[in-house]
Amino acid sequence: MKTAYLYKNQGTCSSHIKLVVEDGRLVTAEYYGGCNGNTKGIAALVQGMPIDEVITRLEGIRCGFKPTSCPDQMAKALTLIKNGESTPSLKIITEEEA
């Protein structure tokens, strides 16, 4: 079953990421804001990948002097999803919102 999430980024130029996950795989990802070409590129590269692999590849990437980045924020969101954690930064959204 596909589940859509909206994650509020912290410390990045992009404000949110919409993630659709099904059976442990990232179906789609869409960033709101940020560097348009880069965030679209990241989303295209990880589409269809197992979330564990996405986390491994993106976790800890920094943007300049910032302690995080748009890819790192995706890894943080997917870690929360994988662990079934609920935070104010992550919410399940309906298909209409997705």
Functional labels for PLM-detected ranges:
Residues 1-6:
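Short, hydrophobic/aromatic-rich segments at coil-to-beta transitions
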Residues 8-92:
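Active-site- and interface-proximal helix/loop "cap" or "latch" segments in soluble metabolic
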Residues 92-98:
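Short acidic DE-rich linear segments
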